[in-house]
Amino acid sequence: MARIVVAMSGGVDSSVAAALLKEQGHEVIGIMLRLWSEPGVIEDDGIERVVQNKCCSLEAVDDARRVARLLDIPFYLVNVEQEFKDNVVDFFYQEYVAGRTPNPCLVCNRHIRFTLLLNRALALDADYLATGHYVRVDDHPITGKRRLRRAVDREKDQSYVLHVLNQQQLAHACFPLGQYTKSEVRAMAAEWGMTVATKAESQEICFVAQNDYRGFINRYGAALAEGNSSSGPTAEAGGVITLPKPGPIYNQDGKVLGRHRGLAYYTIGQRKGLDLTSPEPLHVLKIDAQQNALVVGPALALEQASFTVGKMHYVSGEIPTEPFEAAVRVRYKAIEQPALVTPLEGKRAQVTLLHPQRAITPGQGAVFYGGDNGDEVLCGGLIE
């Protein structure tokens, strides 16, 4: 049997993952990461209140500890607030200010869960780090390399946010829930008497209070302007963090139609909040960070037949030199689309779609699937 560290969150998924491993006879250690959360904010009445978010609330910590007691496993709470802020929160803010739409889960999985926490697990002589993600991992029958595959429950599949993992990380990764459906997981939790069996799951960004990213950007930017390093971003070496600034809104012909509040408050395809008068609905077609400008136009103009991807990561570790066919997912919940992928220099790729798609958004992950059943994650990167 193996020694396995389980990343616990106080939710039903990580709780059942720990229980399954314990039932299989493994030595299980529960670790919960204390992540960064916003400090109190001053409301209109002058009273400072904590803006609630999902990062390690007292309730979540209590739930995780209660499950650990039920399973009779050690439980530790590890503070990684600064690392999370530096690697995930600052990145999230900077990307929005630069006119891109980030997915912070990609960065968190790469730098926090499967680097920082995995290293902690290995320091405890653990063989594996397990999480409650819905995804499968196995060995390729011919090459022996680790494969990342979609979960049995396609509705809950989380392979998209784990495409960033490399072979070394996958060698120590364990995903007990990959073969189960969400309803089966809840049923097991209830059978084991877990109070989290009916706990609602969050679809929100964990560190953004009330799922209001625009409000978060306002508060975070204000903290930066005031020089509050504990609640605002810290510039990394060689990097410059700026604040959202108003700028022009152009149509496709270059005519100025109005002013925007700051690039951080908009995303590709957005229609609401433009404050423009037009006989037809207008959508954000382009976010031009160099000119600090938005370009808007009709919905039909959102369609693209090709795009480029940067920071390409190949799960096998082998970088192809020839074009290859794959199914690409351009957003977390998007439907995969057939595409031709042409590798380029500098960890980039050109993607040509068989069917044009709308609102392909810079900053989002593009994840490519293939293999015998089309459920293997081949590679992924960030849309440029």
What does each of the following model-derived ranges do?
Residues M1-H163, C174, E184-V185, A190, ...:
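ATP-dependent adenylation/nucleotidyltransferase module used to activate substrates
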Residues A130-V137, I142-E384:
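AMP-forming adenylation/ATP pyrophosphatase catalytic core
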